[in-house]
Amino acid sequence: MASGTFTQRLLVALMIFALIADLSTLVAARPQDSDAASVAAAIRYLQELETKHAQHARPRFGKRGGYLNPAIFGQDEQEVDWQDSTFSR
């Protein structure tokens, strides 16, 4: 029985060590709210990303509504016929 209790104690000690190591990394990964310079830098970075991606945004034609005329956007009559539900295939 001495071997069983030693194994149990060793297992409990390893679990406690793993818990302490996990909690220490969790605390170390927490951002510092008192550092105003890093917050300001993060806000500037996000603003730069927003302006960069706003220039590349494209409207999504034909995804949501049928109000756009397909002939305007380069679809010929055959493509329009294939989209028509009354067209016989």
Curated annotation (Swiss-Prot):
Signal peptide: 1-29
Modified residues (Phenylalanine amide): 61
Keyword Transmembrane: no
Gene name for this UniProt entry: npf
Gene Ontology annotations of biological process type: digestion; larval foraging behavior; neuropeptide signaling pathway; regulation of response to food; social behavior
Lineage of producing organism: Eukaryota, Metazoa, Ecdysozoa, Arthropoda, Hexapoda
Main localization of the protein described in the UniProt heading: secreted
Highest taxon in the source lineage: Eukaryota
Any one GO molecular function term: neuropeptide hormone activity
Family: Belongs to the NPY family.
UniProt KW Acyltransferase keyword: no
Summary of the function given for this chain in its UniProt record: An integral part of the sensory system that mediates food signaling, providing the neural basis for the regulation of food response; coordinates larval foraging and social behavior changes during development. May have a hormonal role in females.
Record localization: Secreted
Any single Gene Ontology cellular-component annotation: extracellular region
Propeptide: 65-89
Protein name per Swiss-Prot or TrEMBL: Neuropeptide F
Assigned keywords, A-Z: Amidation, Cleavage on pair of basic residues, Digestion, Hormone, Neuropeptide, Secreted, Signal
